[in-house]
Amino acid sequence: MNFGEAIERVKTRSYIARRANWDNDVFIFAQVPADINEETIPKMQSLPEVVKREITEAGITSLSYQNQICKFDNGDITYYTPTGNEIFANDWKTKSDDTLVEWEYL
C-alpha cells in the first residue's frame, strides 16, 4: 500500500508500519483526541511544571489534543514526520481494531 492509502487508515484509528526497513515494534498511529480539564492539568506528567504554571496563570481551563500523529518505536512514543523515502514507499501495511492479529495489505 502507498503512503496516501496508509495515512487514510491512520485517520480511522488503525495503525501503519513499513514491511521493510523497520523493526517489528515500530509503527505509526494517531493519538485519540482528548480534552483535558483544569483539574487534570496540574497532575499531567507530560508537561513541565513551568508550563503548567503558565497555563494556570493565563486562565486556561482546558487543553485539547488534536490530530497528533505519533511513532511508536520499541516503547518510545514521539511525534512522527515522514521522510521522503517513506512518502514514496509502497510497502506500507496496516492493522485495525478489528484485525489485531493479521496485518492487512491493501
What are these regions (language model features)?
Residues M1-F72:
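Extended non-catalytic interaction/regulatory regions in multidomain proteins
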